[in-house]
């Protein structure tokens, strides 16, 4: 699926990821080699997950990690956590039909605990979009930093004034980080210093 069709489809999936952010996710996934491994922490209904799946090259692996606990049901437009999971299942089924060449795993665990299932230095990209508190992101980063290959990419969503803990922690841990223009996505490469 090309970028234009991917974005048009992704925008039918409810979520907070903007068109610019979706485009960046698609292009970043597309830039990886065949057989790459991408982990997304926090998938909600699957908007960014779908976009990454359409961007990845053949034989790549996409791992979605989410506890699917009812943390967002306090939002007025979310009637129940089952409603969220039903939407994600529909997106997941669509991806499986469209991208039979991908290896896809959905891990229903706490995002930091799920890192135990993944070998060290085996992941090309980890996209952090789960717990947006400083403490939660710190826990996820601590668990997932060893899993990323040298030269691999850490990136995350919601680097904005609505989540000051994300800004503080990312700036502290990754002083050379980059903020993608016109988005709230941050990125940093794993080096010997990470």
Predicted segment positions?
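S-adenosylmethionine/decaboxylated-SAM
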Residues: 2-19, 23-194
């Amino acid at each position: 699926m090309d970028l234009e069709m991917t974005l048009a489809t992704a925008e039918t999936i409810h979520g907070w990821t903007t068109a610019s952010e979706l485009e960046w996710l698609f292009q970043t996934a597309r830039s990886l080699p065949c057989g790459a491994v991408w982990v997304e922490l926090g998938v909600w209904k699957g908007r960014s997950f779908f976009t990454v799946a359409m961007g990845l090259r053949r034989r790549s692996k996409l791992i979605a990690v989410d506890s699917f606990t009812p943390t967002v049901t306090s939002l007025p437009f979310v009637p129940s956590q089952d409603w969220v999971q039903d939407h994600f299942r529909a997106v997941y089924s669509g991806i499986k039909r469209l991208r039979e060449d991908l290896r896809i795993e959905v891990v229903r665990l706490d995002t930091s605990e799920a890192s135990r299932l993944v070998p060290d230095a085996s992941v090309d990209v980890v996209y952090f979009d789960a717990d947006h508190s400083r403490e939660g992101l710190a826990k996820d980063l601590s668990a997932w930093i060893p899993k990323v290959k040298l030269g691999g990419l850490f990136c995350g969503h919601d680097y904005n004034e609505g989540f000051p803990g994300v800004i503080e922690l990312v700036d502290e841990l990754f002083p050379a980080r980059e903020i993608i223009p016109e988005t709230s996505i941050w990125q940093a490469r794993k080096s010997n210093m990470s």
